[in-house]
């Protein structure tokens, strides 16, 4: 596939068809019913017309068409009735204490969870670390761009759930903690460890950041100059310098599954605002719930029409007197050559409760404060 630059496809009956989800080298994935998956597997190709072409041949050379093997509704119902019994579920859930190996796991009785600093699966998340500072709005001036993305960026582009590349920031973290590549598992299985998940944010092998010169994968340039570095390494450098970050997107930013880590990882990278042409509804809400401001361009503007290349610094003005839903704001652009530009924005905080979420630095600190105050 690499040497011939092939665009290969997979067929699956799962509920996700994100790029590179089945395999990093696969660029096309199609969702379909289980019988169709079997049919395409028998055919061995994706460019087949099942109405006119046979999917296989019998041992004596006769053509076999999909219509010859497609089960009728009565056959499906009969098979389900024979193989699926209510007793199966009764037996499975009758003993909720778990198997013997589960019972042998040692645990100490305590009111709270005993965090294991050496665990690569579960770590104490930092989402409550800012509770004492909640109510203090972060500055939105001098922001550095971390990524300039296009249209239809999915939550899987932002926070992939598939395999963990050994040469990426998350893979290097696991290797440094004694985990061999064969034991990496997946991002989805390690979502209890923020150190892994933050390193995996914007690290999808198929994401394209305009700041990375056309390179595919989770790369960017610090200050928009020099060699490509990982998104995570760049964010760490900006944190050392005390500079906040901004991400630009196109239309339908955050589409796909409502993956919470797409917003959590964005927050933990140090991103303070995301500016896009439009947002998917749930991801917009999740960003606010993590204390990240979503803004939409107005008047047809976008990163391309503004000529953004990643060397700029940005400030967002118009929120100095407090936040309110659907507020107008101005994006001030300071270019590397000293010139200035601006664009009108719409704050996509849509309700008063979302104002509370943001000013509390997210929904988690807000809930904790309410519990403590009781």
Where are these regions (language model features)?
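Fe-S-dependent hydro-lyases/dehydratases of central metabolism
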Residues: 1-374
């Amino acid at each position: 596939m690499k040497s011939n630059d092939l665009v290969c496809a997979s067929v699956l009956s799962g509920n996700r068809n994100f790029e590179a989800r089945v395999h990093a080298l696969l660029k096309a994935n199609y969702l379909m019913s289980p019988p169709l998956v079997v049919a395409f597997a028998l055919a061995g190709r994706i460019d087949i017309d099942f109405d006119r072409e046979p999917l296989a041949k019998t041992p004596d050379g006769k053509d076999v068409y999909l219509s010859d093997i497609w089960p009728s509704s009565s056959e499906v119902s009969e098979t389900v009735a024979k193989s699926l019994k209510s007793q199966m579920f009764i037996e499975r859930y009758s003993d909720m204490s778990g198997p013997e190996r589960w019972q042998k796991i040692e645990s100490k009785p305590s009111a709270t969870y005993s965090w294991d600093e050496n665990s690569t699966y579960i770590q104490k998340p930092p989402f409550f670390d800012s509770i004492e500072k909640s109510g203090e709005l972060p500055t939105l001036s001098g922001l550095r761009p971390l990524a300039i993305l296009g249209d239809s960026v999915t939550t899987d582009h932002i926070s992939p759930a598939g395999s963990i590349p050994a040469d990426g920031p998350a893979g290097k973290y696991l290797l440094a903690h004694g985990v061999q590549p064969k034991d990496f598992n997946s991002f989805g299985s390690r979502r209890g460890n923020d150190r892994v998940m933050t390193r995996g944010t914007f690290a999808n092998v198929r994401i394209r950041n305009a700041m990375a010169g056309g390179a595919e994968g989770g790369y960017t340039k610090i200050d928009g100059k020099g060699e490509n570095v990982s998104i995570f390494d760049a964010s760490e450098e900006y944190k050392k310098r005390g500079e906040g970050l901004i991400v630009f997107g196109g239309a339908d930013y955050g589409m796909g599954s409502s993956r919470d880590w797409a917003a959590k990882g964005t927050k933990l990278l140090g991103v303070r605002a995301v500016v896009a042409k439009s947002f998917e509804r749930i991801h917009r809400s999740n960003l606010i719930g993590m204390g990240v401001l979503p803004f939409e361009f107005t008047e047809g503007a976008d990163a391309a029409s503004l000529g953004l290349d990643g060397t700029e610094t940005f400030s967002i003005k118009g929120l100095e007197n407090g936040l309110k839903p659907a507020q107008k704001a101005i994006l001030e652009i300071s270019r590397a050559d000293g010139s200035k530009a601006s664009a009108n924005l719409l704050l996509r905080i849509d309700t008063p409760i979302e104002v509370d979420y943001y000013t509390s630095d997210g929904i988690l600190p807000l809930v904790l404060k309410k519990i403590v105050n009781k």
